[in-house]
Amino acid sequence: MKILSLSLLLLLAATVSHVQSSASVPGLIELLESNTIFGNEAELLEKEGLSINYPNCRSWHLGVETSNIINFDTVPANCKAYVEDYLITSKQYQYDSKTVNKEAYFYAKGLALKNDTVNVWIFDLDDTLLSSIPYYAKYGYGTENTAPGAYWSWLESGESTPGLPETLHLYENLLELGIEPIIISDRWKKLSEVTVENLKAVGVTKWKHLILKPNGSKLTQVVYKSKVRNSLVKKGYNIVGNIGDQWADLVEDTPGRVFKLPNPLYYVPS
């Protein structure tokens, strides 16, 4: 009989969150005995109906923010308490957001702005200026699947979202520097009325443009926002900076420096 090493047993325990009744013992033994366990892990786990678990949620979060962990549908179930603590209890989310926004302000303050054009800063909306935490708190802080479009329906029903104070401070400081905000969101245009009301309620009352996605558009967030930015540049705007909570907000033909805010709740493909 082959003896499985303790280290491999611990590795399996750290990477498998639950075993469905269809999972086969030979398949698991194959995974444990494999000399290339990490190469075979994802394929075998998928085949056996298992899901990957992350024993260190702080490390998982780092992987998300650095775009090393991508294409996840939900937060790992075992990381619910970590995400709640990060966003609510420990205030670390606020501290991290403050650091990003402070650096954005220092960068903007040091710019030599052009006098012959309109200098603008691109803001994302959800989880940049406004927070979706109240919504995702109802669904296990991102650990539970929600139906496509459920968040938009929630907003359309009249629910408002709180402002994110650190980004709101940046918004105010940029206005004082003479840099005008342009808000680009992947919210449907049919949500413009509730969006404007929500923005005004948190103190965002001035913007050069508030651009929402055409109803029913099939463009990905990356393509949509890239097209909007290119259109703004062609109109003569000088984009000096960009801030958002997803890399999808910030990649592909992005003039000016980009600043990535933390968000462990969900992932938008980039």
Curated annotation (Swiss-Prot):
Tree of life domain: Eukaryota
GO biological process: defense response; response to jasmonic acid
First and last residue of the signal peptide: 1-17
Glycosylated position list: N115, N215
Reported tissue expression: Expressed in leaves and in gynoecia, especially in styles, the basal and distal ends of ovaries and in siliques.
Induction info: Expression is enhanced during wounding.
One GO location term (cellular component): plant-type vacuole
Residue intervals passing through the bilayer: none
An annotated Gene Ontology molecular function: nutrient reservoir activity
InterPro entries: Acid_phosphat_B-like, Acid_phosphatase_pln, APS1/VSP, HAD-like_sf, HAD_sf
CDD domains per record: HAD_VSP
Swiss-Prot/TrEMBL keywords: Glycoprotein, Signal, Storage protein
One Pfam match: Acid_phosphat_B
Known role: May function as somatic storage protein during early seedling development.
Sequence similarity: Belongs to the APS1/VSP family.
This protein's name: Vegetative storage protein 1
